Amino acid sequence: RFACLIDRFGVRLIVNPDYAVKNNLCSLRRVEKYLANTYIVPCDIWCGKNPFSSHELYSWYMVSEQADEAGMVRANRKGELVRVPRGQSGNAMPGIAYLLKDDCDVLRTRMEQLCENPESHGFFWEAALFDGAKMIVNARLVPAGEVIEINTYEQLRQRDSASPQLESDKLNVIAAVLGAGTGDI
């Protein structure tokens, strides 16, 4: 599904066959030798503005101004990302980050420690960013709605009805079988 990225951008795809049982902490561990001055970007994110820069001065983890019950952190006045108590909302965490080499070295060590413990296999990779109650990287705060997680076709259609991802042969077949237009799916 992502093979087009190889020819178009020269990326190297690495597959985690254990993803169904080990989540993305173990996926990131599979590419740890490539981590240095690196963006980490989930594949289910929609960005209203390009989040990348040719020069990043510091490591950061992107959070939205939007409150989210699933958010584990909040950005404080110093730009630090601090853990929120259970039951409280934090900032929405779309999952995009940039890590300088030194922070990647720390991340590698923490991922190794976490992945040795089978209880950690279901963790998200962000667990390795924590040092006690705060993350080792600062916040990159973006306005609510600028970066969102897309989990369904309907969410993508609501956010970006002109997206080329909404047009596919599969959708045309589904529409034909159901006797509906693709906009009705």
Go through the PLM ranges and name each one.
Residues 1-38, 117-119, 180:
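Conserved N-terminal catalytic core of the sugar/cofactor nucleotidyltransferase
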Residues 2-3, 24, 28, 48-50, ...:
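Short, well-ordered alpha-helical microsegments
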Residues 7-11, 33-38, 53-60, 133-136:
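Short glycine/proline-enriched coil/turn segments at helix->beta-strand junctions
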Residues 19-23, 68-70, 145-148:
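A short acidic, often aromatic-flanked loop/helix-cap motif at beta-alpha or helix-coil junctions
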Residues 26-34, 77, 154-158:
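Short, surface-exposed amphipathic charged segments that create phosphate/polyanion-binding patches used
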Residues 37-46:
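Short beta-strand-to-loop acidic/aromatic patch adjacent to the donor-nucleotide binding site
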Residues 48-120:
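Conserved core of the sugar-phosphate nucleotidyltransferase
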Residues 92-183:
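Conserved alpha/beta core of the MobA/IspD/sugar-nucleotide pyrophosphorylase nucleotidyltransferase superfamily
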